[in-house]
């Protein structure tokens, strides 16, 4: 039986990356149970990976190799990355808070914190070293166009190969939060300036499917299966009368939620039509309750605990779907022992 190409896609969302990381922890557990293999990892059961912004961090964690060419981090350890380092990544000095007016007139955070975390976790690992084909969206400011970091291209061409820590700095350069990222290829021959690809592909699932088709033009959706993970969404139902008097400040705050939700939901809508099969396409996301506001940079303990609980709720409520999908992943793999 011909096996399907298995695709994993993870949305952007800052510290909310905890949510899909928790879901992946459960998926990894099911894969170990199904295969009776205590070393089973996510990387063994997917063929193409895509992550935007914080999703790129998770993908990098899942695919970075140790010295035995096995994944360096488990999904559980990626959750710990966020919980233990969130305050380092999103750490604004009093001076920076005043200078930026909380991000209104300057970037909200000094990038030294996030850069130190990437240095600690990924060191000199290069894009070409990742264990599986990878697609990570960014926006190139200097040329005014979308750009994708591709592991397959990096393996065949040095002009597409970057240090993972630099790539992630670019992929997470969310506007108003961090300054644009100016990076060079490993061979120092190409120099570019990027911002977070969430401006056009916060849900990179459709881009991942397009990447699959680019490399396999003779194959279609029926030849693939995809797991698409969100980072939690905020209700954006607004009263028309109230919003009729809003100005830039109100729309700036709400507009971020609306844009992020809209980008993610339109990709989901299109992929449901493309796949036309619930068994081959699974989208998992959660809705923030009314007592919690969706925030990319809130690192207070109670909020981090809530993000973990939201991920657990998704995993529990969709347990049957996740277990069924895990079974199909194993069936379409040659690593079943």
Predicted regions: what they are:
Residues 1-337:
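Conserved catalytic cores and adjacent C-terminal regulatory segments
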């Amino acid at each position: 039986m011909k096996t399907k190409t298995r695709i994993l896609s993870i949305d952007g969302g800052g510290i909310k990356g905890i949510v899909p990381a928790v879901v992946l922890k459960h998926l990894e557990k099911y894969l170990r149970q199904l295969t009776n293999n205590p070393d089973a990892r996510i990387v063994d059961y997917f063929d193409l990976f895509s992550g935007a912004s914080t999703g790129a961090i998770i993908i990098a964690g899942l695919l970075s190799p140790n010295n035995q060419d096995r994944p360096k981090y488990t999904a559980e350890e990626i959750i710990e990355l966020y919980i233990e380092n969130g305050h380092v990544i999103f750490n604004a000095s009093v001076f920076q808070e005043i200078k930026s007016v909380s991000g209104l007139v300057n970037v909200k955070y000094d990038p030294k914190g996030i850069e130190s975390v990437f240095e600690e976790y990924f060191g000199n690992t290069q894009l070409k070293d990742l264990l599986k084909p990878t697609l990570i969206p960014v926006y190139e400011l200097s040329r005014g166009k979308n750009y994708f970091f591709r592991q397959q291209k990096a393996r065949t061409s040095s002009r597409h190969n970057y240090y993972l820590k630099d790539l992630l700095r670019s992929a997470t350069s969310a506007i108003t939060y961090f300054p644009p990222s100016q990076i060079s290829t490993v061979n120092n021959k190409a120099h570019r300036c990027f911002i977070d690809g969430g401006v056009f592909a916060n849900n990179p699932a459709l881009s991942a499917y397009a990447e699959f088709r680019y490399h396999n033009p003779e194959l279609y959706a029926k030849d693939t299966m995809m797991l698409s993970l969100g980072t939690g969404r905020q209700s954006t139902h607004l009263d028309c009368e109230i919003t009729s008097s809003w100005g830039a400040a109100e729309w700036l705050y709400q507009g971020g939620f609306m844009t992020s939700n809209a980008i993610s939901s339109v990709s989901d809508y299109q992929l449901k039509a493309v796949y036309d099969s619930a068994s081959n396409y699974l989208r998992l996301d959660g809705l923030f309750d009314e007592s919690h506001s969706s925030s990319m940079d809130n690192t207070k303990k109670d909020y981090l605990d809530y993000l973990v609980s939201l991920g657990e709720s998704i995993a529990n409520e969709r347990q049957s779907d996740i277990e069924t999908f895990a079974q199909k992943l194993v069936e379409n793999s040659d690593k079943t022992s």
